[in-house]
Amino acid sequence: MLNGWGRGDLRSGLCLWICGFLAFFKGSRGCVSEEQLFHTLFAHYNRFIRPVENVSDPVTVHFELAITQLANVDEVNQIMETNLWLRHVWKDYRLCWDPTEYDGIETLRVPADNIWKPDIVLYNNAVGDFQVEGKTKALLKYDGVITWTPPAIFKSSCPMDITFFPFDHQNCSLKFGSWTYDKAEIDLLIIGSKVDMNDFWENSEWEIVDASGYKHDIKYNCCEEIYTDITYSFYIRRLPMFYTINLIIPCLFISFLTVLVFYLPSDCGEKVTLCISVLLSLTVFLLVITETIPSTSLVIPLVGEYLLFTMIFVTLSIVVTVFVLNIHYRTPATHTMPKWVKTMFLQVFPSILMMRRPLDKTKEMDGVKDPKTHTKRPAKVKFTHRKEPKLLKECRHCHKSSEIAPGKRLSQQPAQWVTENSEHPPDVEDVIDSVQFIAENMKSHNETKEVEDDWKYMAMVVDRVFLWVFIIVCVFGTVGLFLQPLLGNTGAS
């Protein structure tokens, strides 16, 4: 049994060894065939000669562009950086073979430096090499069709239109063409009308809206020949979320703080300080913007227009605030309020703005209580009523005809009247003179206080007027500025 089992195992091992040897022999033969094919194709091959049988015939090169990443858009230097795959397809009649003669080999991967290839370059390259490096291999088919798809990183020049920054759209182009061969020697044909974006990685700041390719035949001033190029136009749109959150919204809040200046009471003494603080904040934002946008004097970006508008807005608020404070601290000794000013700012504008002075209610209440003593000085009426009993108490020895009738103002009973109609000792006369002096001082003080209150109320009315004016200008100015990109893009589309 053991002897029989050993013979069967030996037969199985021998069969496996024979199969492996045959497979190895076949693979070795295939490698030999590929090596022989490669040697046969490139034994007398000249990579500097165009692959055409007739010198007058052009080499037809099919070209296609595939984008994998929009790496960066540099607005300051006006450069667009892209990761691309450049697909070239052409036919070389010198590199054809019969697959049946080489064990069915239909394709070869050959180094790109060993074959003739079109010198396609990026015309508007800004940094780096203009031509694609030939370090990658090309796919060669048995019928002579060569497909070469080298990857490349290009930094192309792109004129930036920052009028609507950060809600802007840019149109950047990539112009490819042969640098030395004209149309009679190389004829470029575009594969498809769009850029291949199947392997594209989305960019966090820019969105590719459209990427179309066009073929152009151009005659340059330097030469008589016509040159063919293929230009791809990338229509990209900026995603404004970053700038909206970190730049525009803070600017909006700061600009609306300017409106609160006119709601701040003049007595607090911080109105001008608030205005200057807002102006300094906007200046800092303006310095930040100048580092992110290209230096150009052709246009002013939208954010720059808004900051300029807001800075003018804040500057005017400082001027108005100084004017309001000047009105607020005026006195009868320095200024006299004209009648038309009193009419406009103490009667007309308050009624339009639905403002009502608390002093008016006090006057109405005093007038209802005592119509006979209704005057513009309720405080002095109270003073007279408070002082009259004391005066009568001091003058009890005076003649009855000289008594001061209760309920009448002291200002209507001057000391001269008392002196002429009564007899009293000198000490009582001194008391009456003192009371008259105090009453006159109180009257002058009340008149001064009333004029000062009128100036303060006028300052309050001016503040309220400019509060509404600045609210309207701020809202409509902001909406008008930020509607420009929408209207501009609608018109362009």
Curated annotation (Swiss-Prot):
Q: Which residues are glycosylated?
A: N54, N171
What is the annotated localization of this protein? Synaptic cell membrane
Please state how the activity of this protein is regulated: Activated by a myriad of ligands such as acetylcholine, cytisine and nicotine. CHRNA6 nAChR activity is inhibited by the antagonists alpha-conotoxin MII and PIA, a small disulfide-constrained peptides from cone snails.
Q: Point out residues bearing the modification Phosphoserine.
A: S401
User: What membrane topology does the annotation report for this chain?
Assistant: Multi-pass membrane protein
Q: In which organism is this protein found? A: Rattus norvegicus (Rat)
Instruction: Using the record, list the residue span of the signal peptide; answer none if the entry has no such feature.
Output: 1-30
Alphabetized UniProt keyword annotations: Cell membrane, Disulfide bond, Glycoprotein, Ion channel, Ion transport, Ligand-gated ion channel, Membrane, Phosphoprotein, Receptor, Signal, Synapse, Transmembrane, Transmembrane helix, Transport
Work out whether the entry's keyword set contains Cell membrane. yes
- What is the name listed in the Swiss-Prot or TrEMBL entry for this protein? Neuronal acetylcholine receptor subunit alpha-6
Q: Kindly report every residue range on the membrane side named Extracellular.
A: 31-240
Q: Which domain of life, per UniProt?
A: Eukaryota
